[in-house]
Design a protein with these regions (language model features):
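Hydrophobic alpha-helical segments and their boundary regions
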Residues: 10, 33, 95, 139, ...
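Residues in and immediately flanking transmembrane alpha helices
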Residues: 15-16, 76, 206
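Sec-dependent N-terminal signal peptides of Gram-positive bacterial secreted proteins and lipoproteins
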Residues: 4-24, 406-425
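Domain-terminus/edge residues, biased toward the C-terminal soluble/receptor-binding domains
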Residues: 155-156, 169-172, 176-410, 421-427, ...
Length: 439
């Protein structure tokens, strides 16, 4: 146990060091933009940042979370889903002078239209409608779901007060948190298609609105004829309020390297355009491909328990990983530790991780990334325990009955864990297959 605690403490100290105020900032120093963060879209690794944990008003980039939760609920089944506009969807925005698509109370809106209206037209009434969709019928329920998702993602500098981003003292996020929100949202069915659409979207007439509505993506950095055009940007969400100033989040890709870039509190629109270009040009110049970090042979023993007894131990090790390293850094600049619980209890997903820390010196942000660790011996241990605790039926006395019941309980738990472990292995394999590791 002491070994596991010491190992966990080492990981925590590494994580704290990664984001300590004295850590060298490897990216450009911006003056017209208050904060930014660039991460690897595949691993979530922080590559460059300035004030990335500062809590700021996000404006409409809030809608990344709103859209992500709507896509999660729909699971790709957008067709034939209609949402009915409530009184609150419309009239809670009265006097805000906010962006909208003139939804009317009682209007029946296809889910697909609501998604594209919220994404492309930045419709606050559309965001309200979506919040009711995934929030159990109320905007308040949707906001609660947004905060619950932020907590699940481990975000410490985010709190939502609404689903659209109108400024509120209790509505804030950070560049780091927003980058991780987008990274999560990109895993939801249909979100990336929604986020990266450049073509005009047409919303047909509804039961109360006879006219056709047209939505255009509003980011000049994605318009080929614009002087601000950046071809690497695949998708983006823009935001603005008088308090928040200009906020921005995008997914960009160049030569197989996928980055998420967030900027907040750019003072004027041209500051945002110029600073995003500066950040992406710098990042793509520094990070030209993924480096294979082979398994380092770091191992640990993890106790396995079930049914009130200890079943044995398994071996946990670092699996190796592909990381974005700045030019000038090699695998020798990466260290690895293991993050293990004190005990693995059957029936619960084994929360075991390898933590890779990049020691970036003055060319890359010093930061860490967690990946699922490799576990060996668990299937064999579970199979052995299942066989050992399920004896053939025989006459037993009262004491043996109690022992037999315990054995059956352990055996049932083990069998359930075998099935669960299969699911865990499939889940980890699926996640690895889904992530885009480019070379």
């Amino acid at each position: 146990m002491k070994k596991h605690i010491a190992m966990l403490c080492a990981v925590l100290l590494t994580a704290l060091a990664a984001f300590a105020p004295g850590a060298a900032a490897a990216g450009p120093a911006l003056t017209a933009t208050e904060a930014y963060c660039i991460i690897d879209a595949d691993t979530g690794l922080v590559l460059a940042q300035q004030n990335m944990n500062e809590e700021l008003h996000p404006a409409s980039i809030t809608k990344v979370m709103t859209l992500g939760l709507a896509c999660e609920k729909a699971q790709g089944k957008w067709d034939n889903v209609k949402l009915t506009v409530s009184h609150e969807d419309v009239y809670s925005l009265a006097g805000t002078d906010s962006s909208h698509i003139a939804l009317q109370e009682g209007e029946e809106v296809p889910l697909t239209d609501a998604l594209y209206a919220t994404m492309m037209a930045s419709a606050n009434d559309g965001a309200n409608l979506l919040a009711e969709y995934f929030g159990g019928g109320s905007i308040e329920g949707g906001v609660a779901a947004m905060n619950a998702q932020a907590k699940e993602l481990g975000l410490e500098h985010t709190h939502f007060a609404n689903p659209h981003g109108i400024s509120d003292e209790d509505h804030y996020t950070s560049c780091y948190d927003m980058a991780q929100i987008l990274r999560w949202a990109l895993t939801q069915p249909g979100f990336e298609t929604l986020f990266t659409r450049n073509e005009m979207y047409t919303m047909g007439p509804t039961n109360v609105q006879p006219v056709t509505r047209y939505f255009h993506q509003q980011d000049k950095m994605r318009v080929g004829s614009s002087r601000y055009y950046i071809p690497a940007i695949l998708g983006s969400k823009i935001g603005y309020t008088n308090i928040a100033r200009y906020s921005y989040v995008c997914l960009a890709e160049q030569n197989g390297v996928r980055l998420i870039c967030v900027t907040m509190q750019s003072q004027i629109k041209t500051d945002k355009y110029n600073d995003v270009r500066t950040l992406l040009d710098d990042a793509f110049a520094r990070y030209t491909g993924y480096t294979e970090i082979p398994a380092q042979g770091v191992t640990g023993e993890l106790e396995v328990a079930g049914g009130g007894s200890t079943l044995g131990t398994v071996t946990v090790s670092d699996p190796g990983v592909k990381l974005l390293l700045a030019d000038g850094l090699t695998a020798a600049d990466v260290s690895v530790t293991l993050e293990l619980p004190e005990q693995y209890l059957l029936g619960v997903d084994p929360a075991v991780y390898a933590v890779y820390t990049i020691h970036g010196r003055d060319v890359q942000e010093t930061a860490s990334v967690r990946v699922p660790a490799a576990v060996t011996g668990l299937e064999e241990l579970l199979a052995k325990s299942a066989n050992a605790t399920l004896p053939a039926s025989r006459d037993v006395g009262p004491k043996r009955i109690a022992g037999g019941l315990l054995a059956i309980s352990v055996g049932a738990t083990v069998l359930a864990a075998l099935a669960a472990f299969g699911v865990v292995r499939l889940r980890i394999k699926w996640k690895k297959g889904k992530s885009r590791s480019k070379h």
